[in-house]
Amino acid sequence: MRITNQDKKQGLIEVVPETIDDLWHLSHIVEVNDYVSTLTARRIQDNNSGKTRADRGVKKKFFLGIRVEKINFHKYTGMLRFTGIIESGPEDLIPLGSHHTINVQLNNSIRIKKIWNKWSLERLNQAIEASNRANEIIVAIEDNTTELGIIKQYGIDYIGPIIGDISGKQNIEKNRAQKVNEYYEDITKTLTQQKDIDKLIIIGPGFTKNGYYNYLEENYPKLAKKVILESTGAGGHAGIQEVLKNGLIESLSKDAKIAKEAALVNKLLEQIGKSSNTVTYGKKQVITASNMGAVEKLLVLEDLVRDKNIQNIMNTVENMGGVVTIISSQHDAGQQLKALGSLAAFLRYPI
């Protein structure tokens, strides 16, 4: 994400989203009743012209602004839509007061006018700082099946499964070696479709991960230099979630947002499982703890951040020296926090 224009007095910031992560951030930065505008194009028909229908009309570009009523983000399609009432634009081309949906496009600027609270600005800065980071990819490999997990700001993008035709009595040793190489090559072709790979974390329960690493060393030495091997009790989604929870990703990258969130929620669940009196969850309980100054770390599901009452709790915790972490709802840890009421806290002392 890039900021291309800013007017602090007007509360106006113009940004250019560059990745799906940026669209996700924008879906939580923009709130209902905010004003957004972008350059749009419409073909204006000349009904008096003698031209054929296919030739009629001139495409005109203009800025159109709406007062936001509805926000929709779909991570799988990479689409972000703002729907609302048109407040600005050329009156001869568009009917003011009617409804319109703005489809936010990557690499196209969008203007946002709003009351920028601390949390909105922090989120915007997160998106800007993350824009230059390279990809970190988890390769969860087993004998016949591999899944890739692309680490995003909002969660994990899963690719796969990639299936290898290896097992079976009909595969004699020579044929098996060929099948293994074909399997490894299929994985690598999928991997190399991702740009700017920084780290490649190869995980799995057996020795297949070692075999794949040896294959990379021999055939793709530059890629092999980015590899970290890690044993896990499972492959697939379960294996990827395992390394997110065990702190490996967090230790490898100070910017691994999802890993930090997963580790915090996992620690919370462990403390709850032990019936610890130094954690609490649920809105009522957390409000009580925050008012007492007992909250050391506050976990807030991102879906709640627009709530002014929740913002007050967050401000109270920070003013009393606590740390606030906003948890994405797009990954497993976020769903676990949601099941606990979307709000939880680690306490300085029992209450």
Curated annotation (Swiss-Prot):
InterPro entries: eFR1_2_sf, eRF1_1_Pelota, eRF1_2, eRF1_3, Pelota/DOM34_N, Pelota_arc, Ribosomal_eL30-like_sf, Transl-rel_pelota. May function in recognizing stalled ribosomes, interact with stem-loop structures in stalled mRNA molecules, and effect endonucleolytic cleavage of the mRNA. May play a role in the release non-functional ribosomes and degradation of damaged mRNAs. Has endoribonuclease activity. The keyword Cytoplasm applies. Gene3D superfamilies: 3.30.1330.30, eRF1 domain 2 (3.30.420.60), Pelota, domain A (2.30.30.870). Transmembrane segments: none annotated. Monomer. SMART domains: eRF1_1 (SM01194). Its cofactor is a divalent metal cation. One of its GO terms (molecular function) is metal ion binding. Its EC number is 3.1.-.-. GO terms for cellular component: cytoplasm. It is an enzyme of class 3 (hydrolase). This is Protein pelota homolog. Belongs to the eukaryotic release factor 1 family. Pelota subfamily. The N-terminal domain has the RNA-binding Sm fold. It harbors the endoribonuclease activity. It is found in: Cytoplasm. It comes from Methanosphaera stadtmanae (strain ATCC 43021 / DSM 3091 / JCM 11832 / MCB-3). The gene is pelA.
